């Protein structure tokens, strides 16, 4: 797919590429309108207005597609496009941007089955990829996401099952990781 289409991989699969753990069931991508047209010609495309995205299935796998000036994410897509990196042949957001996108997903899906997976991805990024927290702070300020650092701290403090999902069951180790993660957050 990455050889045929120009897209930015976001969501759980982008987290997986960065951390090498916890795969995702569906694929989330960002594309420009030209690429959306190519997808439309090749696959059945469904517009989901209330979620401001498009959906399709490719080889039985659900793909959520986000486009500039239509899709709503924590950070404008045009800004995400400027803050990417390449990894294993895929273009993905920088870790700080991906962390914010995962926080947005967690807030949007709060109290659903999928929000726990979002929290797992958030912790996984923090533990295994160490995003640049100065860049994170700068970005949340720039886009008026002032509640995000506080929510990030809450996610770290309240995490229990999320650590189990990551295979971390030793309570001492969990406590040490939480302490280290909180120390890494800036006020």
Q: What residues fall within each predicted segment?
A:
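Compositionally biased terminal segments of proteins
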Residues: 1-187
């Amino acid at each position: 797919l990455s050889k045929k289409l120009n897209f930015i991989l976001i969501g759980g699969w982008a987290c997986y590429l960065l951390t090498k753990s916890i795969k995702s069931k569906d694929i989330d991508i960002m594309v420009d309108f030209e690429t959306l047209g190519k997808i439309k010609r090749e696959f059945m495309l469904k517009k989901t207005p209330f979620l401001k995205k498009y959906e399709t299935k490719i080889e039985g796998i659900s793909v959520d597609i986000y486009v500039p000036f239509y899709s709503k994410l924590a950070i404008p897509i045009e800004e995400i496009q400027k803050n990417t990196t390449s990894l294993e042949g895929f273009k993905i957001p920088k870790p700080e941007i991906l962390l914010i996108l995962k926080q947005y997903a967690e807030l949007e899906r709060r109290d659903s089955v999928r929000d726990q997976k979002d929290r797992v991805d958030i912790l996984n990024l923090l533990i295994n990829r160490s995003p640049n927290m100065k860049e994170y702070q700068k970005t949340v300020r720039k886009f008026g996401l002032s509640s995000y650092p506080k929510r990030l701290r809450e996610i770290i403090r309240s995490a229990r099952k999320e650590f189990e999902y990551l295979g971390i069951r030793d309570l001492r180790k969990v406590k040490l990781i939480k302490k280290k993660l909180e120390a890494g957050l800036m006020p």
